[in-house]
Amino acid sequence: MIAEADMEVCRELIRTGSYSFHAASRVLPARVRDPALALYAFCRVADDEVDEVGAPRDKAAAVLKLGDRLEDIYAGRPRNAPSDRAFAAVVEEFEMPRELPEALLEGFAWDAEGRWYHTLSDVQAYSARVAAAVGAMMCVLMRVRNPDALARACDLGLAMQMSNIARDVGEDARAGRLFLPTDWMVEEGIDPQAFLADPQPTKGIRRVTERLLNRADRLYWRAATGVRLLPFDCRPGIMAAGKIYAAIGAEVAKAKYDNITRRAHTTKGRKLWLVANSAMSATATSMLPLSPRVHAKPEPEVAHLVDAAAHRNLHPERSEVLISALMALKARDRGLAMD
């Protein structure tokens, strides 16, 4: 059980650091809301610790430390930090499969490498780790292990991350980061390296953004078919999360896909309206027949997450994939230290 003092720290972290999720979480039942806030607080702290350091060597070191912290959490001896203790309680109570938070750490390792993503599949592989894994963990918190529900939760995670990528193109470029499919950029005559050196809201970059958001919209649409597989009192919160993040893409579109000179956002009032609308939508959709699209196969990039969550593999050793990612970072760290 999560200590109340730790829970209060987690609530404050999300209230001030993730407005969209905080708004959606308000309509989740308490039995899911508090563990979800603890999960998101751990993810937020982990992301900030990697994102806020400047030098590549420091980012690599931050990811390596996170790997050790996750090891301690699954060993039942979390570090003396509220988010670690709270997440350790969640892991124990809900039998959280270790592959899911490990996937998140692998995504952070990719961030630390400064990796580029050449194809849509590459972008989805990254989004699977930093967002779809969280969607699968949310299903675990709702005590849902149905593979179809997990696949649709992963669709939602992919779509939400694509919305974030589309919103943050300019901000990321100015920080030397690039998450758009570079082959799409090349098709538009955009040299990725030149774009990072001087990001401009050209017609080509707007078309790439529109294309990515169209893909996100298709995933949001398919994800919505899975809401019926969730506990009734959880449906409004999950629908709200999807609507709030989809609204980010709508704001980007409203700005004619200029994500370089402006950063799209939704107002607090708009978020609250979407939350209220989701409560009504959840009731209405419960009266409709289940869509056959709910049974669609998971995207190949998230299949391992669906499998891990469905089969309750709680305490494996560190996965070979994560070990490889961490070893690559260690080697890179040593190389940077020698420069």
Curated annotation (Swiss-Prot):
A Pfam family the protein falls into: SQS_PSY
Keywords in alphabetical order: Carotenoid biosynthesis, Magnesium, Manganese, Metal-binding, Transferase
The protein's annotated pathway: Carotenoid biosynthesis; phytoene biosynthesis
Note accompanying the cofactor annotation: ATP is required for the transferase activity but it does not seem to be hydrolyzed during the reaction.
Needed cofactors: ATP; Mn(2+); Mg(2+)
The EC number(s) this enzyme carries: 2.5.1.-
GO biological process: carotenoid biosynthetic process
Enzyme class: transferase
PROSITE patterns: SQUALEN_PHYTOEN_SYN_1, SQUALEN_PHYTOEN_SYN_2
InterPro entries with a match to the protein in the record: Isoprenoid_synthase_dom_sf, Squ/phyt_synthse, Squalene/phytoene_synthase_CS, Trans_IPPS_bact-type, Trans_IPPS_HH
Protein name listed in UniProt: Phytoene synthase
Family: Belongs to the phytoene/squalene synthase family.
One GO molecular-function entry: squalene synthase [NAD(P)H] activity
Purpose of the protein: Involved in the biosynthesis of carotenoids. Catalyzes the condensation of two molecules of geranylgeranyl diphosphate (GGPP) to give prephytoene diphosphate (PPPP) and the subsequent rearrangement of the cyclopropylcarbinyl intermediate to yield phytoene.
